[in-house]
């Protein structure tokens, strides 16, 4: 799939929003990518995940397990795992810390791919990497539907994205939209 084909899916799903947004990272932005608008359409989710799976297969081979952070990474991890024919699990927050629950495990020595819907600063992905590594897993790659950093985030492993785009963001104290008096909204999964 080309970047234009991926972008068409996001446009058709009305997932590209304009306004003033407070991101999970705490930064502010004039654009927001609401992947849930894409993920509500199983054919789009399957198509994008198969694309990510093909990139992963070519780039790092077949992992033992795919793992994504709740909330946004669950469907992506599941569909990528399905396309690769491997287990798919997810982490969730417990008392503010990312953890494996529901008897999910990463076995020592397993090769892991971390999947996410959107990467901005990479904070949630790094937490999942830490969980997988602490369990004895070897993280081979990260994959996301959208890389908002346009390739600027470094996880220390190959990073594959279906769509890479540069989206401006600022610390709240430097946000021009705040200075204009425009209220910021928090559209993401962590409010």
From Swiss-Prot:
Ligand binding (orotate): 120, 148
Keyword Isomerase among record annotations: no
Biological process according to GO: 'de novo' UMP biosynthetic process; pyrimidine nucleobase biosynthetic process
Sorted UniProt keywords: Glycosyltransferase, Magnesium, Pyrimidine biosynthesis, Transferase
Gene3D superfamilies recorded: 3.40.50.2020
UniProt GO molecular function: magnesium ion binding; orotate phosphoribosyltransferase activity
Pfam families, alphabetized: Pribosyltran
Protein family according to the UniProt entry: Belongs to the purine/pyrimidine phosphoribosyltransferase family. PyrE subfamily.
Role, per record: Catalyzes the transfer of a ribosyl phosphate group from 5-phosphoribose 1-diphosphate to orotate, leading to the formation of orotidine monophosphate (OMP).
Subunit field text: Homodimer.
Protein name: Orotate phosphoribosyltransferase
